[in-house]
């Protein structure tokens, strides 16, 4: 404010000096010009508030503000369009069987059967099967050198082996050392041995686990049936834990490390 008053004072002084006559007066004429000096007045009072101006230009984009809180969950939208069909999935596990359905209607009657011709054909086939069975049995006995019953097949192996090796050989063929558990089986084995012209063979009886407690090669215990020869078993030299059969059908206990022929036994059900 003081600066403005000082400026006004200077301007007034200059204006006053300009009005004084100069040292060389000039004649007044028609061409004379008058000089006017405008001196600013004092600052007036504040005017009335003007009208609202036009909107200014948009300012610069400000910095990104902080992330606001999550808003409320919106309403469920409408169902969208169906997407593309996806790839075929892997095959699932087999489900449980369903309930048995109701019986179906009876079928139409079949054609009349010519039973007499069929019976005749079946009878002829039965005869052929019986003949083939007999021929096969003969081939087994004559060529293969085996003997058989309704449930067993016996094979005489002409290879000298110790008892343990003989048992392994029979097992490798799918059987075991022969086990005469009754009179019929013992008689068949003895006849087989005699017809082959052999004096003795290993059979599937031993007391390797417990002295004097003889068992068959399938580990079943001996019961009432036996064919021990007179004075047997005697466990001579305290080493006779295995059993042989002689051509007469009798049994002797012998040393297991002795080598001789042996007889194998096979179940027909497992053949």
UniProtKB/Swiss-Prot annotation:
Binding-site list for a carbohydrate: 200, 240, 244, 252-254
Residues forming coiled coils: 114-148
Tissue expression summary: Ubiquitous. Detected in adrenal gland, kidney, liver, ovaries and testis (at protein level).
Annotated ranges, domain Collagen-like: 65-112
The protein's assembly and partners: Homotrimer; disulfide-linked. Interacts with MASP1; probably triggers the lectin pathway of complement.
Basic and acidic residues composition bias: residue spans: 45-54, 66-75
Task of the protein: Lectin that plays a role in innate immunity, apoptosis and embryogenesis. Calcium-dependent lectin that binds self and non-self glycoproteins presenting high mannose oligosaccharides with at least one terminal alpha-1,2-linked mannose epitope. Primarily recognizes the terminal disaccharide of the glycan. Also recognizes a subset of fucosylated glycans and lipopolysaccharides. Plays a role in innate immunity through its ability to bind non-self sugars presented by microorganisms and to activate the complement through the recruitment of MAPS1.
Record disease entry: 3MC syndrome 2: A form of 3MC syndrome, an autosomal recessive disorder characterized by facial dysmorphism, craniosynostosis, learning disability, and genital, limb and vesicorenal anomalies. Facial features include hypertelorism, blepharophimosis, blepharoptosis and highly arched eyebrows, cleft lip and/or palate. The term 3MC syndrome includes Carnevale, Mingarelli, Malpuech, and Michels syndromes.
Record-listed Ca(2+) 1 binding positions: 207, 211, 235, 240-241
Region Disordered: start-end pairs: 44-113
Source species of the chain: Homo sapiens (Human)
Cited Pfam families: Collagen, Lectin_C
SMART domains per record: CLECT (SM00034)
Signal peptide: 1-25
Domain of life: Eukaryota
Protein name: Collectin-11
Disulfide bonding pattern of the chain: 170-264, 242-256
GO cellular component, one term: extracellular region
Binding site for Ca(2+) 3: 211, 238, 241
Binding residues annotated for Ca(2+) 2, in chain numbering: 232, 234, 240, 252-253
Family the entry assigns: Belongs to the COLEC10/COLEC11 family.
Cellular compartment(s): Secreted
InterPro entries: C-type_lectin-like, C-type_lectin-like/link_sf, C-type_lectin_CS, Ca-dependent_lectin, Collagen, Collectin_CTLD, CTDL_fold
Keyword annotations of the record: Calcium, Coiled coil, Collagen, Developmental protein, Disease variant, Disulfide bond, Immunity, Innate immunity, Lectin, Mannose-binding, Metal-binding, Secreted, Signal
Boundaries of every C-type lectin domain copy: 149-265
Record-level Gene Ontology MF annotations: calcium ion binding; calcium-dependent carbohydrate binding; D-mannose binding; DNA binding; fucose binding; identical protein binding; oligosaccharide binding
Record GO biological process: antimicrobial humoral response; cell surface pattern recognition receptor signaling pathway; complement activation; complement activation, lectin pathway; developmental process; execution phase of apoptosis; positive regulation of opsonization; proteolysis
């Amino acid at each position: 404010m003081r600066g403005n008053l000082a400026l006004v004072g200077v301007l007034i002084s200059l204006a006053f000096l300009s009005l004084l006559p100069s040292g060389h007066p000039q004649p007044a004429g028609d061409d004379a010009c008058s000089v006017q000096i405008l001196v600013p007045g004092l600052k007036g009072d504040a005017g009335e508030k003007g009208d609202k101006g036009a909107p200014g230009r948009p300012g610069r984009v400000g910095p990104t503000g902080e992330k606001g809180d999550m808003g409320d969950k919106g309403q469920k939208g409408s169902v969208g369009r169906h997407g593309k069909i996806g790839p075929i999935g892997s095959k699932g596990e087999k489900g449980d069987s369903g309930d048995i359905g109701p019986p179906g209607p009876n079928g139409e009657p079949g054609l009349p059967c010519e039973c007499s011709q069929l019976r005749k054909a079946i009878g002829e086939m039965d005869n052929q099967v019986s003949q083939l069975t007999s021929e096969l049995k003969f081939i087994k006995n004559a060529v293969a050198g085996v003997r058989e019953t309704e449930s067993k097949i016996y094979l005489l192996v002409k290879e000298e082996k110790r008892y343990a090796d003989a048992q392994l050989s029979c097992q490798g063929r799918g059987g075991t050392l022969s086990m005469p558990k009754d009179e019929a089986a013992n008689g068949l084995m003895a006849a087989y041995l005699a017809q082959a012209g052999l004096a003795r063979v290993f059979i599937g009886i031993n007391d390797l686990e417990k002295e004097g407690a003889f068992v068959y090669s399938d580990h079943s215990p001996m019961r009432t049936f036996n064919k021990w020869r007179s004075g047997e078993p005697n466990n001579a030299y305290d080493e006779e834990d295995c059993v042989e059969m002689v051509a007469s059908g009798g049994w002797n206990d012998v040393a297991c490390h002795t080598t001789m022929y042996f007889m194998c036994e096979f179940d027909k059900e497992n053949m």
